[in-house]
Amino acid sequence: MRANYLLLLAATAVQAAPFIKRYENTTAPASQLSTSLADGSTTILGSSSSSVEEDETITSTIVQYVTVTSSDTTYVSATNTLTTTLTTKPTPVITTEAEDDEEDNETITSTILQYVTVTSSDTTYVSATNTLTTTLTTKAAEATESEEEENETITSTILQYVTVTSSDTTYVSATNTITSVLTTKAAVSTNDVSENAKAATTEDDGETTTSTITSIVTITDANGNTEVLTEVAAETSGAEDASYCVPTTVTVTVTAEQTSEVVSTIVHTTQVPLTAEFTLDDTTTTLTSWVDLTSTDLVTITSTSSVYDSYSTGASQSHPISSYSNYTISDYAPPISSYYSL
């Protein structure tokens, strides 16, 4: 498995890039599993008292590949296909000698440990270890002739998360917990083969599928603040309506402030005359010039609005009437106090 990822070493230097691990799972539909179990019950009941059920085969297939993306290059590793096939030999059922004895339950557990190591010229990335555990528990066939078998439950749990560690940084992805529970109704045992076959095909109404996914998302902003969000999505539906979903109602409340402030900038320009007199003997000369004085004021205007509770007319008003209190700014008189001496 490790040799297949050496194709990622084509680049001499790979920067720390997002670590992506994809799973493509192939799952047999619940209807096929239920039919297979029912057919097995039909075969065993139609045989003689010393006949044996057919072999039971469980196949699990996982397709894996890794994609590493740098600034301008994408490296895709080879595709690994992990296939696990388990064949069990059922215990013979002898109806003539063990009519009242119940066989022990049969439990099959399959565990797969997965991790990926990516090595560049100076950095080694090691992912976390994923443990995929599948447990299959089946109720052995009872030896009685008319008693009904108990339900069959299949539970599959997958814990997924990825941790990428470089020389000084550790990246941890969210943790996903995927749990699937499949419960099927066992076929009723009778002496008549035709009656049992009919029950296996018509009385499969106890099938329930439950899927629960828990996701943990960590968000870090530019200031270094970290927020952890947990989202649980669960859906339960019967076999008769696989597309059923529960609607969600979202209520949004908006509250408006009754007081608002507006800041305005006022620029005032005033021309001030400057006069100078020069006297030489009996001659007086007067010089007059104009100087522009500019001042800037910041004015804050506050207005308060309120909605009338009722209106004087009898007609229904589609738009409420608002009352405003206005403030008037007095005429501006620049405080000019200048003294010129020539």
Swiss-Prot record:
Membrane topology, record value: Lipid-anchor; GPI-anchor
Carbohydrate-modified residues: N25, N105, N151, N326
Signal peptide from the UniProt entry: 1-16
Propeptide residues per the UniProt entry: 315-342
Keywords: Cell membrane, Glycoprotein, GPI-anchor, Lipoprotein, Membrane, Signal
Residues lipid-modified (GPI-anchor amidated glycine): G314
Any one Gene Ontology cellular component term annotated for this protein: plasma membrane
Expression induction or repression: Expression is induced during infection of reconstituted human oral epithelium. Expression is repressed by HOG1 and regulated by TEC1, EGF1, NTD80, ROB1, BRG1, and SSN6.
Localization, UniProt: Cell membrane
Domain of life per record: Eukaryota
Name assigned to this protein: Predicted GPI-anchored protein 54
Organism: Candida albicans (strain SC5314 / ATCC MYA-2876) (Yeast)
